[in-house]
Design a protein with these regions (language model features):
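Short, charged, intrinsically disordered terminal tails
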Residues: 3-8, 66-74
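Short, charge-rich amphipathic interface segments used for partner binding and complex assembly
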Residues: 35-71
Length: 74
């Protein structure tokens, strides 16, 4: 499975660029959460539980990013 990440440096970015990056990251994280959830179904009970807990935390983080987007747009 090929997966590409575009890593960003600590260079200053405009507010518009930051907002675009946040939107991308929220969507990207949501996609990974879906993949992880599906993967959990193939694991042992304890491992699946740990992955589902991780997905929950990832979803919480993604929601914080979405809130930041709303604040920035608002």
């Amino acid at each position: 499975m090929e997966h590409k990440h575009h890593h960003h440096t600590n260079e200053s970015v405009s507010a518009e660029e930051a907002l675009a990056l946040l939107k991308y990251m929220a969507q990207h994280n949501a996609h990974h959460a879906e993949e992880l959830q599906a993967t959990a179904d193939s694991l042992s009970d304890n491992a699946a539980l740990l992955i589902r807990e991780a997905v929950s935390l990832l979803n919480q983080s993604t929601e914080k990013i979405r809130q930041a987007i709303q604040e920035s747009e608002g």
